Amino acid sequence: MTNVNEIIVPKNGYANLINDYMFKRVFGSEECKDILISFLNHVLDDKKVEDVVFLPTEHLGPTEDDRSAVFDIACRTSSGDEFIVEMQNAAQPFFKDRSLFYTSYPIINQAALAKEKYFEEHGNTIGFTWNFRLKPVRFIAITKFKMDHAADWPSDKYHSSYHISEDNLGEFLNDKLQFIFLELARFNKSESELITPYDKWMYLFKNMADLKSKPDIFSEKEFNRLFEIAEFVNFTAEQYREYQKAEKMLYDYHNTLDYARRQGLEQGLQEGLAQGLEQGLEQGLEQGLEQGLREGLEQGKKEERLEIARRMLEVAMPIGQIVDLTGLSMEEIESL
């Protein structure tokens, strides 16, 4: 008799690379370090990563009241460059700001590392000074959604890279901070159109879970390894259980998001119309309706995020993750 709780691993098919468990296994484990190195080299183009050391992904603020940060992947190369690699499945308020905030942790930590090294060499920290010479910090995000850009941004430009540069002449202040975004929602190439390694990575992020076998075009060593790791037949029961758990959380999140969006929009429109009609009597019907609808929709968006947070709490999602996903404050979430 088959145990209803028994995990049955599929005999064919591949895992979804943007699944939280799978993403961290492929890009954040010693088992697959060679795949991460290959990915970084393809993303950076002009840089060469020889080796990486994985770093802690949780960073606490200076005090209990300060915001903490939890990265998907954090690593340091043999040359000292630090990388944060994030998979972002859902759009959220101020994502670009959050990206900048995350890079502050490895930057600030470089002073502490310099002090530790001085202590190892001298046995004490007497006379220690730091010259502020930074190692590069690079933030890479793969997003499932389209990010906001200028109106003339090409709709199919899925790769963007940012540095700190002078406003008019474009001169780099320095090369110590870089942000790279890969937008899956802007990538629409078919298998026959894949040319660059970038194309191939983007295609697999979007389509690997739908493949029945490895296409011949993915002949490189790193892709052979990736297909081997991602094939369900090579999963243990425990690995598949963790994969399914992450799939369910993502499914629940999108269901919650859809429900809250519909509820929030409906409520926002109703409140906006009511408020607009009332203001319309005093200010002129057209202007009052326009303002009321705008304010009502904004209120609807806030209600939507609160409802999303409520449902995330119901499935025991960590509060820190809810804060990141919804943009709500810790206090707002704890009061639900």
Map each language-model feature to its residues.
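Elongated, amphipathic alpha-helical interaction scaffolds
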Residues: 1-336
